[in-house]
Amino acid sequence: MSTKRNMKNENFVTFEVAKLLQDKGYREDCCASYITDETGRSELTVVFGVRKFRHLSIYTRFQYEYLAPTLYAAQKWVRTKGKIHIVVELNKHGWYYRLYDTEELSLISQMDGYTDTFEKALNDGIKESLTYL
């Protein structure tokens, strides 16, 4: 059984973050994408192959299509492209993120408040890091 078949929505960036990533130049191959119809409703579609940026939105029934990388792939892309490392930590209040500059080894930003899952904190950290790119 392929590991891709076991992937859940929480393993991928949210629709909002997928749009921001694409606006910032994310063009890596993915196994998932968000599609929107003419009403603006979005849906995550996981394929058992690879979605390439140049092949997005070739189907006329979709208004827009956005690459949907895994949280890890997006985190790595931000670290590579933006020189920003996203750290997710846990304390008695919940999960939170911190952003570090990988060249100056300094704290850039950290989350105000907490979330109930690691995945939400990482997604929020990716979203925040994109404001620095």
Segment roles from a protein language model:
Residues 24, 80-84, 128, 132:
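Surface-exposed polar/charged interaction patches
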Residues 1-6, 58-62:
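Charged, low-complexity surface segments at secondary-structure and domain boundaries
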Residues 5-10, 36, 90, 100, ...:
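Intrinsic-disorder/low-complexity regions
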Residues 33, 41, 105, 120, ...:
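A generic signature of intrinsically disordered, low-complexity regions enriched in glycine/proline
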Residues 3-43:
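Extreme N-terminal leader/activation tails
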Residues 19, 27, 41-116:
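N-terminal segment of the canonical double-stranded RNA-binding domain
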Residues 111-133:
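Ampiphathic alpha-helical segments that act as solvent-exposed interaction surfaces
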